[in-house]
């Protein structure tokens, strides 16, 4: 067992203590009328706040914002927690026990600040509020690692969030001195084009002044890139503004076309108007918001890079599909040569995302935000990405051997050969020491029917045979259920 597997196993063992509730528990919290059993030694070891609370001569009163001290008799019984909500408190405990957390509300779950019943809650107001509440709790209880993780989550959210939510995060980032998040949000607000009188309804005057200063600097910077004509000093500024507005209009038209499955219009925009699909983030948008058929048609245009890193985090479309736990999207991206080993700015691969979701899902009783995941889809996504990664790894090894033997004339092999993939799949499942295989087949499949779906009834037989070769056992009932 590798060091990574050992650490993952240790993390899951500790998290299991939290899930089992009363097992070896020596402290009970009451949060919003619900009891949460925990363990003093773990909380004290992981949080300075809890260490002082349990062991200090003068414990903090932070669990009760009314300021009432918790006496010894109360600390030996049920401890009321009024400073945070149940969901946020449980997310924080999960991180304290395991070092991992997923700050995402349940998919399609009715949320207080989200009226869309089909929302994935990836960047809506409800998702932003949950992340902000988690960040506040992490800072309050002194869990700095969780605070940093939540800041990264918020930085990813605000790229697609509404401008109102961006301003909400902007205020929180200033209040808690989060400079990187402040920079991201302030630039987004500056680029929004909202006039100061509108910003004044949401932001204090000093922040509006900083936003206007950013706009001025940005305008001067862009103007300096173009030669000046002294007879008309305002000409270039107006030209740049018009060009930016034109690009925004193109992107909005492109998204409307994708929403209506009109890929032909997108093609005309690429050929006739010079639309850059990568800069417009067409593929990430289609993966997250459109159907598999639209994504496939967009890829077949040949104008979008399937491995293009988007946003400040550098996520590729395959990263997004992995986060969505969508085997349809994962399959079509891999069919068009998406790289399963590509990393984000933080060094995370699509396989890492699926591994984390797998370990989190196994303990969904302690993770309110992950109960929506369908085990069959998660298992299939993990299997597809693992198989593709194994094939690429072997191909790279073969290419290196050929290069060492000066056999440069050999032709490149297909990325997903039928027999080759089948061999990799069976070799992978015969390795009993592999942590991912144990998680997928012993746990994810333990409480669910082995009923999976066909990925693309309209695709050609070649692609279907490729995926069947990855895992023949998964498709023995493939006509009985559709995703």
Swiss-Prot record:
Every BTB domain range: 25-105
Additional information: Fruit abscission does not occur in Lotus japonicus.
The entry's keywords: ANK repeat, Cell membrane, Cytoplasm, Membrane, Metal-binding, Nodulation, Nucleus, Repeat, Ubl conjugation pathway, Zinc, Zinc-finger
Any Pfam family matching the protein: Ank_2
Biased amino acid composition, Basic and acidic residues: 456-465
Binding site for Zn(2+): 114, 119, 121, 124
Matching InterPro entries: Ankyrin_rpt, Ankyrin_rpt-contain_sf, BTB/POZ_dom, NPR5/6, NPR_central_dom, SKP1/BTB/POZ_sf
Name the UniProt record assigns to this protein: BTB/POZ domain and ankyrin repeat-containing protein COCH
Similarity field: Belongs to the plant 'ANKYRIN-BTB/POZ' family. 'NOOT-BOP-COCH-like' (NBCL) subfamily.
Any one of the GO CC terms: cytoplasm
PROSITE patterns cross-referenced by the UniProt entry: ANK_REP_REGION, ANK_REPEAT, BTB, ZF_C2HC_NPR
Role noted for this protein: May act as a substrate-specific adapter of an E3 ubiquitin-protein ligase complex (CUL3-RBX1-BTB) which mediates the ubiquitination and subsequent proteasomal degradation of target proteins. Transcriptional co-regulator involved in the promotion of leaf and floral meristem fate and determinacy. Promotes normal stipule growth and development. Required for the abscission of senescent organs, probably by regulating the cell wall disorganization in abscission zones (AZs, e.g. pulvini at the base of leaves).
GO MF entries: transcription cis-regulatory region binding; zinc ion binding
Ranges for the ANK repeats: 249-278, 279-308, 313-342, 346-380
Region (Disordered): 395-435, 450-483
Gene behind the chain: COCH
Pathway note: Protein modification; protein ubiquitination
């Amino acid at each position: 067992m590798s060091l990574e597997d050992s650490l993952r196993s240790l993390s899951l063992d500790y998290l299991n203590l939290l899930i089992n509730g009363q097992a070896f528990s020596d402290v009970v919290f009451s949060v919003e009328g619900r009891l949460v059993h925990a363990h003093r030694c773990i909380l004290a070891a992981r949080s300075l706040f809890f260490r002082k609370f349990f062991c200090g001569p003068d414990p903090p009163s932070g669990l009760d914002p009314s300021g009432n001290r918790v006496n010894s008799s109360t600390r030996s019984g049920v401890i009321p927690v009024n400073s945070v909500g149940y969901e946020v408190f449980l997310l924080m405990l999960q991180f304290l026990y395991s070092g991992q957390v997923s700050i995402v509300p349940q998919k399609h779950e009715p949320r207080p600040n989200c009226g869309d019943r089909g929302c994935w809650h990836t960047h809506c107001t409800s998702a932003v509020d949950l992340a902000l509440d988690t960040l506040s709790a992490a800072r309050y209880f002194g869990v700095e690692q969780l605070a940093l993780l939540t800041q990264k989550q918020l930085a990813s959210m605000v790229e697609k969030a509404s401008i109102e939510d961006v301003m909400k995060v902007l205020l929180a980032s200033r209040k808690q001195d989060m400079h990187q998040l402040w920079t991201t949000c302030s630039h987004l607000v500056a680029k929004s084009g909202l006039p100061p009188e509108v910003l004044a309804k949401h932001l204090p005057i000093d922040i509006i002044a900083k936003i206007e200063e950013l706009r001025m600097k940005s305008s001067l910077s862009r103007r300096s890139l173009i030669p000046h004509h002294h007879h008309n000093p305002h000409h270039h500024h107006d030209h740049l503004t018009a060009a930016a507005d034109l690009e925004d209009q193109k992107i909005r038209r492109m998204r409307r076309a994708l929403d209506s499955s009109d890929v032909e219009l997108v093609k005309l925009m690429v050929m006739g108007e010079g639309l850059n699909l990568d800069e417009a983030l067409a593929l990430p948008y289609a993966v997250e918001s459109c159907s598999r058929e639209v994504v496939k048609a967009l890829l077949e245009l040949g104008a979008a890079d399937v491995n293009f890193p988007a946003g400040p985090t550098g996520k590729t479309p395959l990263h997004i599909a992995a986060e969505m736990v969508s085997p349809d999207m994962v399959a079509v991206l891999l069919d068009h040569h998406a790289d399963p080993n590509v990393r984000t700015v933080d060094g995370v691969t699509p396989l890492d995302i699926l591994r984390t979701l797998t370990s989190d899902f196994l303990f969904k009783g302690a993770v309110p935000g992950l109960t929506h995941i369908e085990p069959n889809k998660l298992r299939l996504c993990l299997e597809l990405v693992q198989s593709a990664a194994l094939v690429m790894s072997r191909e790279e090894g073969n290419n290196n051997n050929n290069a060492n033997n000066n056999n440069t004339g050999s032709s490149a092999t297909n990325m997903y050969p039928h027999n080759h993939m089948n061999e990799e799949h069976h070799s992978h499942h015969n390795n009993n020491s592999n942590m991912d295989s144990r998680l997928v087949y012993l746990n994810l499949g333990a409480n669910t029917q082995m009923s999976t779906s066909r990925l693309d009834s309209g695709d050609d037989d070649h692609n279907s045979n490729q995926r069947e070769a990855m895992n023949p056992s998964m498709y023995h009932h493939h006509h009985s259920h559709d995703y």
